[in-house]
């Protein structure tokens, strides 16, 4: 089966597993997905992720608060294959007035909205996470 938007598929898998309070979720591997997951881990939205040697799937450990409250409240794909969304460093929006992050694909790799503003680089706005 051909997937037209693998990033949206990854976000949907994380969203669905999060809603059902699963501890882990499997995601088909790619370099871009690994980079996005690295940013999500750095920002504290997921616990961990790893790619086993014998597998093509990334295993993502989701993060929950001590009272079983979900850390990820929402995920939204912004730039889609049919409608790409680009922004300069000054045009990158804040997500929930800074409570969430925008994932931006730049020439320096995948950055959060605040990192992109500090680095003065724009790019494609991939998703919002809050």
From Swiss-Prot:
<keyword id="KW-0689">Ribosomal protein</keyword>
<comment type="function">
    <text>One of the primary rRNA binding proteins, it binds directly to 16S rRNA central domain where it helps coordinate assembly of the platform of the 30S subunit.</text>
</comment>
<dbReference type="GO" id="GO:0019843">
    <property type="term" value="F:rRNA binding"/>
</dbReference>
<dbReference type="GO" id="GO:0006412">
    <property type="term" value="P:translation"/>
</dbReference>
<protein>
    <recommendedName>
        <fullName>Small ribosomal subunit protein uS8</fullName>
    </recommendedName>
</protein>
<dbReference type="InterPro" id="IPR000630">
    <property type="entry name" value="Ribosomal_uS8"/>
</dbReference>
<dbReference type="Pfam" id="PF00410">
    <property type="entry name" value="Ribosomal_S8"/>
</dbReference>
<dbReference type="InterPro" id="IPR047863">
    <property type="entry name" value="Ribosomal_uS8_CS"/>
</dbReference>
<keyword id="KW-0699">rRNA-binding</keyword>
<dbReference type="GO" id="GO:1990904">
    <property type="term" value="C:ribonucleoprotein complex"/>
</dbReference>
<keyword id="KW-0687">Ribonucleoprotein</keyword>
<dbReference type="GO" id="GO:0005840">
    <property type="term" value="C:ribosome"/>
</dbReference>
<dbReference type="GO" id="GO:0003735">
    <property type="term" value="F:structural constituent of ribosome"/>
</dbReference>
<comment type="subunit">
    <text>Part of the 30S ribosomal subunit. Contacts proteins S5 and S12.</text>
</comment>
<keyword id="KW-0694">RNA-binding</keyword>
<dbReference type="InterPro" id="IPR035987">
    <property type="entry name" value="Ribosomal_uS8_sf"/>
</dbReference>
<comment type="similarity">
    <text>Belongs to the universal ribosomal protein uS8 family.</text>
</comment>
């Amino acid at each position: 089966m051909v997937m037209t938007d693998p990033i949206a598929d990854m976000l949907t898998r994380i969203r669905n597993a999060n809603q059902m309070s699963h501890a882990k979720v499997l995601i088909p591997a790619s370099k871009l997905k690994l980079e996005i997951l690295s940013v999500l881990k750095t920002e504290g939205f997921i616990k961990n992720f790893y790619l086993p040697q014998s597998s093509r799937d990334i295993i993502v450990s989701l993060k929950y608060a001590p009272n079983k409250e979900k850390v990820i409240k929402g995920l939204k794909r912004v730039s889609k294959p049919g409608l790409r969304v680009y922004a300069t460093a000054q045009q990158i929006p804040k997500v929930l007035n800074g409570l969430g992050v925008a994932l931006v694909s730049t020439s320096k790799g995948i950055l959060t909205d605040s990192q992109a503003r500090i680095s003065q680089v724009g790019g494609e706005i991939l998703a919002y996470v809050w």
